[in-house]
Amino acid sequence: MAEPVLEDTYLTFSSDFDYIAIAPSPFDNFCNSNSDQVRNSISDLRFLIDDDDSFDDLYFPSENESFCIPPDATKREMSGDFTPASGISGDCVNEDTEKNTNGVLISTSSCYNRESPTDSDFSGTSQSLSFSGQDSAKRKTEIEEDSSDESRRLGKDGFASVIKVGGEEDDEKKKNVRLVRNRESAHLSRQRKKHYVEELEDKVKNMHSTISELSSKMSYFVAENVTLRQQMGTRFSSGPPMVPIVYPWMQYPAYMVKPQGSQVALLPIPRLKPKHSVAKVKKFKKVASFSVFGFLFCMFLFGALVNISYGEYKSNYVTDGVYDQSRGRVLVVDSSRVHCGGDSDQGVGRNVSETENLGPPRNSSEPLVASLFVPRNEKLVKIDGNLIIHSVLASEKARDSETKNEEGKSVLATTTKTLSPALPLPDSTSPRTRDVSKHLYSETGKGLSSSGSDDASNDQLKSTIANGKMQQWFREGVAGPMFSSGMCTEVFQFDVSSNSGAIIPASPHTQQCKNTSDTQKGKKNRRILSGGLPVSDFNLTKEDHNSSSKDKFRETKPGPSMVVSVLVDPREGGNGDIDGMMGGTKPQSRVFIVVLVDGVKYITYSCVLPRPDVPHLMTS
């Protein structure tokens, strides 16, 4: 079909612009354009742009590459299918042209709205159109061949930019959404990379600052270690260095020889200390602590059992085995006849001197605390028996003084003069004390045989009161019936022997003066045996001393029987009315009397007391 050539009288183009290929409008139909067509007009350009908005993938021909323009393009005139209308303005001319512009095949469909000329003008122009059907057919075939070759070449190079007219709206929307999403993701990824790089830079800076600080500290420590090593080396240096030796063959002056080792301080090499030494020290400390604690525990354990009392009374032989305790006061026998060369003006009731009494001084009015267990009615009865020991000692002194009694007084009178009170009265001048003291003394014979003389007792009482020394050893009544043989029963007895554990009688006074070197002391303490018995006679650990004691015991003359103590049952005693003495209104029904027979045997009797008007014996 021949295409008519349209000669536009209204538009005048220069010769330079006649053959320039102008890109057609991207709109599908300009006359029927609306909002949807305008919105989708951009999607017709099938240029795929990267996220970084670069045109690296686009193909641009080089300068030497020629455009794909057909050779007869210069002779070609603008032609198109023209359909005349009936003189109505705004006729649409649908012109479909296919041109090869810059090697790109473009298919456009455009609508031109122009003023329709008058009928006269249109007739003039139609006459000037020339139809050449053969030329147009040839031109179409050439254009198709060129376009196929060009598309084939672009496919090989990996670039095909063919814009198709009309597409589905869904595909266009998806492409737009994908493009926006890609751009946003690219922007976010760039921001993340930027922040990550900034954080890495901050960390690197911090690491560099930390490394610099550590290096400075290390250098400081090294320098300090070097100074300390130098100080230690100078402190323990053996002496100045040796002077360099000048050898005779050296023609030049002597030079300093470099000593062994380098002058530069070496870095300290840490050495691990052996662990076994520390373990040994800890083990030694543990053993020492355990031993100390064990020693202290033993001291506390055995210290509580051992009675540590320096200078106190030590129980003697039989008293430990027979009697429970013996804490009573020791009687002091002190007179001019007992001591060899002693002072005659010393009183009977003086205390022991400080050199002889190692224990603390006691009050003379302190009550005697002692006990004696006696079998009675198939039971053991506890009796206050502290006076037995003192009675034995008093009897020994009485027998010694009996041989040298020039005035011919009885044994009991001599004993009462030489004994100090065991239980003193607080005040002898008070009427009540004087009334009680009348019933405290009697002779030994009268107490045993219930027959005696009142004159002897009266003389004894008068002499005692006249001297001011009220003896309170026996607490018996002066008047009234006394004991009979049917009223007393023997409880137990024990002999005085020289064997270990027995009571040894005192030797005569003449032998004590001859055998004792300490004869100038005026006070005698029988508790610590200071002069009462010779040292050689009292030592029972050696056989010769035991034999000498036996000889002295055999030489001792048996004396008459005497009462050494009178004991009462503490269960039958009442509370004392007078301070410091045994007394009470409750009468006693039974007493225990200790008698020394022939100076070698002590017999304890249990006697039943009669019930007179006046109580004979009072106890606390």
UniProtKB/Swiss-Prot annotation:
Chain residue ranges for the region called Leucine-zipper: 211-218
GO annotation, cellular component aspect: endoplasmic reticulum membrane; nucleus
Oxidoreductase in keyword set: no
Top-level division of the source organism's lineage: Eukaryota
Ranges in the topological domain labelled Cytoplasmic: 1-287
InterPro entries listed in its UniProt record: bZIP (IPR004827), bZIP_sf (IPR046347)
A molecular-function term among this protein's GO annotations: DNA binding
Keyword tags: Activator, DNA-binding, Endoplasmic reticulum, Glycoprotein, Membrane, Nucleus, Stress response, Transcription, Transcription regulation, Transmembrane, Transmembrane helix
Subcellular location(s) per record: Endoplasmic reticulum membrane; Nucleus
Biased composition (Polar residues): 109-135, 352-364, 447-460, 508-519
UniProt membrane topology term: Single-pass membrane protein
Family: Belongs to the bZIP family.
Subunit structure: Interacts with BZIP28.
Protein task: Transcriptional activator involved in stress responses.
UniProt protein name: bZIP transcription factor 49
Species for this entry: Arabidopsis thaliana (Mouse-ear cress)
Gene of this entry: BZIP49
